[in-house]
Amino acid sequence: MNIYDLIVLGAGTSGIYCASYGAMKGLSSLVIEMTDRIGGQPAHVYPFKKIYDFPTANGILAKDFVDQLYQQQKPYITQGLITYLHNTTIQEQNYLDDQQLFELKLSDNQHVKAKKIILATGNGGFEPIKLKDELIQDQNLDCIHYKINDLTQYQNKDLCFLGGGDSAVELINQLADLKIAKSLSIIHRNHKYRAAQALVDLINKKPINQYLDQTIELIKDNKISFKDNQSGESTQLNFDYLIVQYGLKPLKSLECFDHLEQDLNNNFVINHHHQTSDPNIYAIGLASNFSKRPNLILSGMYEATVAIKHINDTINPYLRATDYLLKE
């Protein structure tokens, strides 16, 4: 049975860097990810969204940012300090007092052991909120996209976005800037967008057909019919691709950690070391969301360093490692 210093649950940006920083300290990590790829929401939901609020990331695409995080840790993967398991969840966890180790049963029936566990699961697993089945009739579902993986497929196509949050508005702005689509339209159920005002200001300056305060009636044969909530007037648009950005809904995947103390929002309660009510289990990122916490990629990475430093000091109490560069 494999024994690791750390089990990192969740391979979003916080979890990826958590494993990297642990490897810098010589700690071995098994990173368990319930989906088929790493990166969390930046990879799964908005890979073509640009990141500005991270040091040195001056408009880097989210997918490229995730790739850079992975490239940083590739030497540690080669050394065997970082291992990934995809499409995997933890089914059972028990703490063996005599060995001071966790024993975990995974969804593939594999058993592993670890000294510490770090929960980096964000809001838990998630999946896109999809269109209601009754709205879709005689429609090729391949033309309905809930995430964007390849922009080239939209070359000279009629695109229609559904949604009015940051993801929908920012993505359609980017496509307008790239000038690859034949036409761009956006349909939103409310009378105003739920996106940042700076993004809304941009969309109003671009050749984008906007339909606000609308109710979707039918999607059939690459046509979408919708009704104005004020006038009752119906409209029909042709599309090549329908891009749905209604947000995400959580998937419950942490049942075996329900014994840990949680707040009213189901976030794990932590101390200043990011330990949960079980001192051998840590939580970082949105899994430990607390009042006034900045919802930034940078925040999760800082929290990873706090947790890793405490774990390393606990596992290797006589190893006096520095967390800064010494001047020569």
UniProtKB/Swiss-Prot annotation:
How, per the record, is the cofactor bound?
A: Binds 1 FAD per subunit.
Q: What keywords tag this UniProt record?
A: FAD, Flavoprotein, NADP, Oxidoreductase
Please indicate which superkingdom the organism of origin belongs to: Bacteria
Q: Which residues bind FAD?
A: S14, E33, Q41, Y46, I90, F126
**Gene3D superfamilies (UniProt xref):** FAD/NAD(P)-binding domain
Stated name of the protein:
Ferredoxin--NADP reductase
Among Pfam families, the record links this protein to: Pyr_redox_2
EC number from the UniProt entry = 1.18.1.2
Summarize subunit and interaction data from the UniProt record for this chain. Homodimer.
HAMAP family noted in UniProt: FENR2
In terms of InterPro entries, this protein maps to: FAD/NAD-bd_sf (IPR036188), FAD/NAD-binding_dom (IPR023753), Fd--NADP_Rdtase_type_2 (IPR022890), Ferredoxin-NADP_redctase_2 (IPR050097)
What cofactor is needed?
Answer: FAD
Family in the record: Belongs to the ferredoxin--NADP reductase type 2 family.
Q: Which residues cross the membrane?
A: none
Recall the GO molecular function terms of this protein's record: ferredoxin-NADP+ reductase activity; flavin adenine dinucleotide binding; NADP binding
Kindly state which reaction or reactions the protein catalyses. Answer: 2 reduced [2Fe-2S]-[ferredoxin] + NADP(+) + H(+) = 2 oxidized [2Fe-2S]-[ferredoxin] + NADPH
